[in-house]
Amino acid sequence: MGQKVHPHGFRLGISTDWKSRWFADKLYKDYVGEDVKIRRMMSKGLERAGISKVDIERTRDRVRVDIHTARPGIVIGRKGAEADRIRGKLEKLTGKQVQLNIIEVKSPESDAQLVAQGVAEQLSSRVSFRRAMRKAMQSAMKNPVCKGIRVQVSGRLGGAEMSRTEFYREGRVPLHTLRANIEYGFFEARTTFGRIGVKVWIYKGDAVPGRETPAEAPSRPRRERGDRSERPRRGRSGSSGTTAGGTEAGRAAATTIAQAAETPSGESVDAGAVASAATQPAETQQEG
């Protein structure tokens, strides 16, 4: 399911947070419609601003809108004229007082939405899709925060008659791991052959507080192994006594046979005694 489901919704409450924070009972439908219109207005009116995401928070008589952008100067405008214009539109749309916050994205090369938007702009400019994908991946992996990236494009790539999907990946992108902090971005490139969808996944390590990752977890202390002479010797159950007995019996039999060989020819030796001595196991005493 990690390959199918939206990475942001899949990890809500675990490693990601809601982009709209408010509570409503009867006005739930109206608020959802307003949020969609606000984000659509930002995406269509400020294409060159490089907007990563828009967070919306509502209270009883105020709406707070946080715009995360890579180019805050375009959103603010000259002497704040553009910001005032956007605030006026939002107040007219919501009918409430709007608090507009413009937040700059420090590293746009490692932001999934901005990377997808950059690849889509290059595809619209007729740049080779492979070159655009590899360039975006190389610039993203230069950031030490980025642990892995995957870029996927789908559509009539290179003006082909049949649409297809291609992707490139570098590093680790664990889509099934819930504690993984994965950013996801999607953007559509408009070309003369049709639209090409661009999807970007960026893995930035684990983001669950109070939980140690395998790399950060302290290693378990290893028990020092003593010298072999210091360790107690463990005998095999039922085998040590038998082995010792068999050895002593063999020695006794060899001694008896040697004595028989040294006996003078006139004296007779009991063959049965020799055989019984050879076969009878010697008694072994075990020290307590």
UniProtKB/Swiss-Prot annotation:
Gene3D superfamilies xrefs? 3.30.300.20, Ribosomal protein S3, C-terminal domain
Gene Ontology biological-process annotations = translation
* PROSITE patterns the UniProt entry points to: KH_TYPE_2, RIBOSOMAL_S3
Q: Which residues form the KH type-2 domain?
A: 38-106
A GO-annotated cellular component:
cytosolic small ribosomal subunit
Stretches of Polar residues bias are at: 277-288
Q: Where is the composition biased (Basic and acidic residues)?
A: 219-232
- Annotated membrane-spanning segments are none
Q: Which family does it belong to?
A: Belongs to the universal ribosomal protein uS3 family.
Q: What is this protein's function? A: Binds the lower part of the 30S subunit head. Binds mRNA in the 70S ribosome, positioning it for translation.
Q: What is this protein called?
A: Small ribosomal subunit protein uS3
